[in-house]
């Protein structure tokens, strides 16, 4: 059913990717209640900090309660844009369960062109059941960082729910622990939750980032 299967969502196509368009699109989604923004698109032609990156960082500054996640490039070289925005949660992919502790064969790595660590986290993104084409009920099995990013963003949504309902102490609602989290806090808790993956050079690193997000490390999740 997905990581945050009870959540509501808003979605839009991307008619162009100018700074103004991207900023305004994020604001539009914020205005209808969206707080965790997942994006499975990018520009593989450059590693530079671009106007799109500026739009993400400006939005994250202006709307501090929002968290913006981006799938990193599937190329196995340096991360591209706009996942290299300072405030973006850049997401790479692992294999699917039961091999979720293994890096997928695709996905870029840091550092960014200005020497910041990316990606931040990994999530399952290989052999993922998804919607297909041809009919309204079609399904397909797909792979890519585009599949991993929604899983990481949904994990952030679960963290947000626990914080807003005061569940962070023991998993039960408690008004004494209710907070309205910032996007930066959601991002930080996802990174803090991470567990090391098999092989590779360990974490944190330019290949793994802070490694695979695992929200059970920061949330008192119910059993079963």
Which functions belong to the PLM regions below?
Residues 15-16, 95-98, 126, 195-198:
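Acidic glycine-/aspartate-rich tracts in secreted/extracellular proteins
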Residues 38-40, 68-73, 91:
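Active-site neighborhood of phospho(di)ester-bond hydrolases with catalytic His/Asp-centered motifs
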Residues 42, 57, 61-64, 96, ...:
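Sec-exported extracytoplasmic/periplasmic mature domains
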Residues 1-21, 32-36, 45-49, 62-65, ...:
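Subtilisin-like serine protease catalytic core
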Residues 168-170, 177, 181, 201-224:
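Secreted peptidase-domain scaffold signal
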Residues 10, 67-69, 129:
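Structural detector of well-ordered beta-strand residues that form the stable sheet scaffold
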Residues 42-44, 72-77, 96-97, 127:
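Catalytic metal-binding/acid-base residues of hydrolase active sites
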Residues 80-161:
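Extracellular S/T/G-rich loop segment that most often corresponds to the catalytic His/Ser-adjacent loop
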